[in-house]
Design a protein with these regions (language model features):
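TPR-repeat structural position
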Residues: 62-63, 96, 130, 164, ...
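Transmembrane alpha-helices and immediately adjacent membrane-cytoplasm interface residues
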Residues: 5-39
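Alpha-helical adaptor scaffolds
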Residues: 87-92, 100-108, 113-125, 195-196, ...
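Alpha-solenoid helical repeat scaffolds
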Residues: 81-85, 101, 114-119, 135, ...
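Structural motif corresponding to the intra-repeat A-B loop/turn of tetratricopeptide repeats
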Residues: 59, 93, 127, 161, ...
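TPR/TPR-like (Sel1-like) alpha-helical repeat modules
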Residues: 108-109, 142-143, 155-180, 249-262, ...
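Alpha-helical segment of the N-proximal tetratricopeptide repeat
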Residues: 40-78, 85, 123, 199-209, ...
Length: 371
């Protein structure tokens, strides 16, 4: 009986305790209800402010938009979006300090670090501070090495600054992000410009120093670009100008033996450390394989001029003019005829050149010939 009485008493006490705890819980819940209601109301207000702020920004009411968006950033469920839009509104009012502050707030959210950084870079570019934008983008590119938007924007800034070494160094990452073909034009432009910059680099008073720098750079050029005719022509041309004619000639001959391209023979015009007679032998060998090729004929004519072989030069230019109506050949021919004292032929060559131009000019009224 005692044991049973104890069990009954314990059960009663437990039931009473449950009732009391339930009552206390309900009381606490009811006491917190106004707090939750207040929070819900604040979030609803913040959402309306975010929506209204965005619409005001679209309508060009930047000051009103900024005020609404800042309030939404402080109380709403979407603080990241609110701070980013507030930064845009402040930037449009040229309030740099405020826009930077809002972007810092956005950066505090891990998800907003990259987009806030991109906006900082864009604002810096808009304000005329490309170096500041570049520094910001470099940090972002290290944080997110595969982010396409960051990499492309960074590349555009480097290209606008003509920092070809940095852009060429960035190209492997760009190609991994976008694929081999997407950035091929930018890569080609960058390496062509870097070759030119190196060949004309200030501080090198001697051609030997610049030529050596150029050769070192050529080793770093990607293999597929070393097979690009325009790239080969640019590099070989600079080598020739800097006294590396033998290397330039070997490079041109090697490439042409694999694949012919009319952009390569003119490199021989810049070679001064090989005799014109030897160069003419090479050119005449190419002409035997490709008779009437205007690029080779014009180059041969100019090399013949260097050798003071006037008759031979005239023959090459005439052949080029007759085979292709080359404007360059006609101009060279007119100049040579004039120098030889044959004004009549010089005038005829000039008129043939002019007739070519007339086909490219718009049809417009002209004065009648005077009687």
């Amino acid at each position: 009986d005692t044991t049973l009485g104890f069990v009954v008493l314990a059960a009663l006490l437990t039931a009473v305790a449950i009732v009391i705890l339930t009552l206390l819980g309900n009381a606490a819940w009811n006491a917190l209800e106004p707090v939750r209601a207040t929070r819900r109301w604040k979030k609803a207000v913040a959402a309306r402010r975010l929506r209204s702020g965005f619409l005001q920004l679209v309508d060009g009411e930047q000051e009103k938009a900024e005020r609404l968006l800042v309030a939404a950033g402080e109380d709403g469920d979407w603080p990241l979006l609110a701070w980013l839009l507030a930064a845009e509104a402040a930037q449009e009012q040229e309030n740099v300090e405020a826009s930077q502050r809002y972007l810092e707030n956005a950066s505090s959210d891990r998800r907003g670090q990259l987009v806030a950084g991109l906006m900082k870079a864009r604002f810096a570019l808009d304000d005329g501070y490309p170096e500041q934008a570049r520094q910001e983008l470099k940090v972002l590119a290290d944080l997110a090495p595969r982010n396409k938007r960051i990499l492309r924007t960074y590349a555009e800034v480097l290209e606008s600054q003509k920092d070809w070494p940095a852009l060429c160094a960035l190209m492997p990452r760009l190609k991994r992000a976008f694929g081999e073909g997407k950035e091929s034009r930018r890569e080609r432009r960058a390496w062509l410009a870097l070759l030119q910059e190196t060949a004309r680099k200030p501080g090198f008073n001697d051609a030997d120093g610049r030529r050596e720098e150029l050769r070192k750079l050529w080793k770093d050029v990607p293999v597929h670009l070393k097979n690009d005719p325009a790239m080969v022509a640019r590099y070989a041309g600079f080598l020739a100008q800097l006294g590396g004619g033998k290397g330039a000639l070997n490079l041109v001959r090697e490439h042409l033996s694999r694949e012919w391209d009319d952009r390569l023979p003119p490199v021989l015009e810049a070679i001064d450390d090989i005799s014109p007679d030897d160069l003419l032998q090479v050119l005449e060998g190419w002409l035997a394989e490709r008779p009437g090729n205007a690029a080779v004929l014009i180059t041969a004519g100019r090399v013949a001029l260097k050798a003071r072989l006037w008759g031979k030069a005239q023959g090459f230019f005439e052949a080029a003019a007759n085979s292709s109506q080359s404007a360059t050949a006609l101009a060279e021919l007119s100049r040579l005829y004039q120098a030889l004292g044959d004004s009549s032929k010089a005038q005829k060559a000039f008129e043939r050149r002019l007739q070519q131009l007339e086909g490219q000019l718009p049809a417009l009224p002209m004065p009648e010939k005077s009687l």
